[in-house]
């Protein structure tokens, strides 16, 4: 029996692993399709009600590109896989900053504007500091373990609301709300105005894709972690984070190929802020998230 046990274990892993990979890939595809459908439907509704393109970009489009991270982290939190929920955000932000900016710079030099240096980058650093403070209960108040509590989640969501208010105020002050720039007008022209029934279908179908795909993706990631004998934190920081960052990577590379590499910086900063303030904020508000030594210090 002792000789047969390892053989049986390997046999089971060989059977389960392809299914887990199928769940992972299939779930990610459903998430991407769902995010695309939801974004198209919501953007069409926004255009129908004459909502400015800058508002659409800051809300609907930003949600669309970060929907994989949001879906996976919330699904993980609901399933009790806190390591995947947190590792997904931390790993995704690391992937965004190093991989996406690096790949974009390989295609074209990236010019950092003065506003980006003065506004967006400090906000991005602030979000990381806020997460560092919320996630280090043991170091700060001597608690027995590090937990992102419901209070921490609500605090992060408050920061997200402040960030949105600040962004809208800056856009209004600069005249972007009343007199959109040429590039914003072009973006607005590219938004398809769908019939009301089709917009509703896109939105509902997109939500269904996000929910079902999120469950499949988390189940696949957890199964792969068990099959490889590694922690869910490692899978969350690497495989899951890389998969959920694919929309940002594709957007940034396409922007670089179209000679607009500066879009990559805004894309990365916006995604990183959204991930920490909104994704982790929502996840921790639903259920407390316990941090391990891998996802924390």
Residue positions per predicted region:
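Hydrophobic alpha-helical segments, chiefly the membrane-spanning helices
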Residues: 4-297
